[in-house]
């Protein structure tokens, strides 16, 4: 172990002050930082940095933005009309831009998106030269806690045996449960697709907290974290699938990942394996998953995301007993908002001195 500069993960989880003295393993740090920081355009340090936002930040959050650098000028608007009117003044936007905004965004150099995923952003903006950063990794602590909670509900029989007792207002007699319905995670293998913020954090929690063996794939070359036994490129995906006891969708939504978890994948999984969908619903074929659950191809699924959100009440997923679902809420927590503001402030500070920005998005790759 040796002292190094804090990674974006330590910064986002602990805050700027705590991160300054953080000691972590260098290999793990590099593995989590999947995207290289973006170098902002050169600018005169004395010029005011006008930041435009329509987001309803709290007053104390706005004060933190102003504290990032002495020349920060905030332009806070409440309506789309105000946003368009003030856009020509802005150098930085906290929010999003559309193709229709671009003619007025003549001075905008950098957009800080409010979400981790950027697949829904306007195509014209995504092909523009404006730098883009996102909120990746700020959601990871909350999402991965939800993921482990879902997995425990499935493996420990909580969702199938213990939750329904409240609807019936009766508890099954002691000794009637079957040991076969209660699986232990220690020694099991988790396979993660997408070793970004969610994937790398989940790997560490599964391995260090539950003694699981973790393997994974990622489209970007990166050092293997200590918590991961094997890390390969996406070509290893179908080799990995039959090996794992838990298969996790944690990759961004791109043309390459859309519906990658399909009938072939679910049929290739162990009958005792579980599927977790954490990043984007468009990564899996929902009807194929329903068949997998109903026909026993897999043991169960935990879903925080769905292809269409929310799914209609007539969707057959609601007929499945071996599934745990949440309405895309796994990233929610008061602490998440603190991490979001920490990232905004740190990136404003970096921008003001011409330092690389954190969480840079490769617009061409889509994440």
Regions found by a protein language model. Name each.
Residues 15, 97, 115, 249-251, ...:
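Glycine-rich, N-terminal phosphate-binding loop of Rossmann-like dinucleotide-binding domains
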Residues 101-107, 124-128, 266-270, 292-296, ...:
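Short, conserved loop/helix-junction motifs that constitute active-site signature segments
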Residues 8, 29-132:
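An N-terminal-biased, well-structured beta-alpha scaffold segment characteristic
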Residues 219-316:
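Rossmann-like adenosine-cofactor binding region
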Residues 195-196:
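Glycine-rich Rossmann-fold phosphate-binding loop(s) that bind the pyrophosphate
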Residues 33-36, 133-134, 138-146, 154, ...:
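C-terminal helix-to-coil terminal segments
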